[in-house]
Amino acid sequence: MSTSSSSAAERDFKREFLKIFFLVFAVLLIGFSIFFLNHHEKNKYIIETLELNGSAEDGDALFKMNCVGCHGITARGLVGPDLHSITKRLNDKQIIKQVTGGLTPPMPSFEIDPINMSNLLEYLHSLE
């Protein structure tokens, strides 16, 4: 009797273990899938942006609407840093991530379409 009850307990333990194992596996699989899909979308955005030929003039207008409050009308910095020569300190991919992700507080993140991001990059390159 004790043998059958111990083997029943073993089976119950194995079932519970397998349930937990597969649950953890499923959660990890979903988490990794979400991460990689999001990462792919960001790379797609960056690639699309970098393939465009932006306009410094349009980028200047965009800058004046969204950025002067922190970076100043001449982009020399106020609350935010001076952006002259920013393209010598950061590459275009890093700048895109900074603008869209707000990586260094208090910089907010901006949802900006690829053509406007390309325009902003051209404007920043013109500040050198």
Where are the regions that the model predicts?
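C-terminal capping alpha-helices of c-type cytochrome domains
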Residues: 11-41, 111-128
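Extracytoplasmic/periplasmic beta-strand context in beta-sandwich domains
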Residues: 32, 81-82
